[in-house]
Amino acid sequence: ICHHCGERYIEFFPNAKQENLFIGMIHAFQYMGIPRYVLTDNMKSVVLHRDLDGRPVWQKDYEAFMRTVGFDTKLCKPRHPFTKGAVERLIRFVKENFLSDRVFCDVTDLNWQALEWCNAQNGIYHRAVDGVPQQIHDAACSSHLRRLPDSDEVRGYLCPNRRISFDGFVNYEGRRFGVPYSYAGSTARVMRSGDTLYIYSTDMNSLLATHAVTWSHRDSFCEGQYEVQPEEFPTAPVKTQLRQ
């Protein structure tokens, strides 16, 4: 949520892994832009502890993420209801105004409805900011925000690395997705976008397979998963024969 105009973006994940924190933050930056500061709770995926002078000791992967994307983080002060409330008020607002009395088919449907709800909320008048959040954001906030850089480092956060099992599957969000047997690498990168899951080579130069995200716990096989590579035949006539 933008502290100045109240524009909001929410996204749900099936677990609270740090890689999903990074994916959700990148999607929020794509939606609203990158601010100078991000206010966050004192989560272990963000900060380990504070030193003797009270300065935060960042979790190393989060610190690298900050440097890559280009923003600084401010932490909620312990036992300080004003800053703590700034983070938790949105959670309460979402629970009471979005999640209440709704039925969702799966996480994909949940996020589609969440995005529609955010667009609707950002486009109506809110008394707290005395205006329409989207209009205030475009007029006053956008000039202070940066666009998300289109770099291999950022794409790497959107496509986490996964090890390929001996039977040709990668595990992502509690389910297994097939990788073509012809791929020689031991790892692959995985990205879920909407209702489709994409599997790329480790260098992200090749798309290996796509899967429909059904949220079923059954293994998802890709087309021709166990087919061997096609045999190459000579183009010129064969003149030499071997007799056994």
Identify the meaning behind each predicted range.
Residues 194-244:
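Protein C-terminal end segments and domain termini
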Residues 10-37, 214-221:
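Active-site beta-loop-alpha junctions of metal-dependent nucleic acid enzymes
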Residues 8-15, 48-53:
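The substrate-binding groove and active-site-proximal loops of carbohydrate-active enzymes
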Residues 1-6, 13-14, 39, 65, ...:
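Short conserved beta-strand segments at catalytic cores or DNA/RNA-binding microdomains
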Residues 55-73:
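Two-metal-ion acidic nuclease core segments, chiefly of the RNase H-like superfamily
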Residues 91-191:
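Active-site-proximal acidic segments at structured loop/helix or strand boundaries
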Residues 34-54:
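Acidic/histidine-rich, metal-coordinating catalytic segments
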Residues 40-41, 52-53, 73-95, 110:
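RNase H-like two-metal-ion nuclease catalytic core shared by retroviral integrases
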